[in-house]
Amino acid sequence: MMRKVDIVRNVSVVRSVSIVRSVNIIRKRHMAAALLGAVLIVSMIPVRVLAKDRTGEGWRDKVEITAHRGDNTQAPENTMPAFKAAVENGADWIELDVTQTKDGVLVIFHDADLMRMTGKPDKIWDMSYEELSQINTASHWGPFFKDTRIPTLEEVLDYCKDKIKLNIEVKVNDHQTQDFIARLVGLIQAKGMAEQCMITSFDYHSLQAVKQLDPALETGFISSKAIEQPEAFTSADNFVLSIDLINPETVSRIHSLGKEVIAWTVNDAYSVDKCRKAGADNLITDKPRKIMED
């Protein structure tokens, strides 16, 4: 016969076991709920990724990125720091603008005058390179680039060789020498960079001149207007079109000619998605790092 103390002990053990079992059941329920919550969260992740990655899987393997005037979010446009930033950030191409000084030197600068970049009204074609080289073109960036100068094309070619491809836009005006295009093509050839460069311009005659000098040198016709007969532009290997001209029909027609479509200027996810869906081959952007990361 069990003693009263033993009965009490047995009851306590039973109660303890019951409590442990109850706790374990509660824990399992909480774990199940937590696991279910985790599954729900994980199941939502692809939706978030797809919502952000509007360009589609693997789009960077199909589309090249061109840094417009270098990476001009990191340094002043069309300067060596901007070109170096584009290389360091992994852009495929740099787009830059070439023009000519009073003494015939090929320099990298977009505008006809210095007003926007320096506050000075002087025209590029009225100044020698020696005069231009004394001017800081990054004064509006504060002290960060206090010694930044207008680079020569030769300087840029030397730095970029075997590092990155160049989309060299010809800025045409009435003050350039007659051998302007010949100097440009000759310098590219002398540096052994013909396969690394593409000459582009709004001026189709400049592209014709390029092809006469070097038929193998790649060219691109820039346009902000619809091109009704792209097949007529035989001296253009590619077409550089403003973003509003990009659509599947236009891109398909140009592709049927064996030519590529380069879109400008593409600075947001919507524009990237538009170009990708249309089949554009190359995107010129002011924000290369952001476009590549998104």
List the predicted regions and their residue ranges.
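N-terminal secretory signal peptides that target proteins for export/translocation
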Residues: 1-26
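Phosphate-group recognition and catalysis centered on beta-loop-alpha active-site segments
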Residues: 4, 28-294
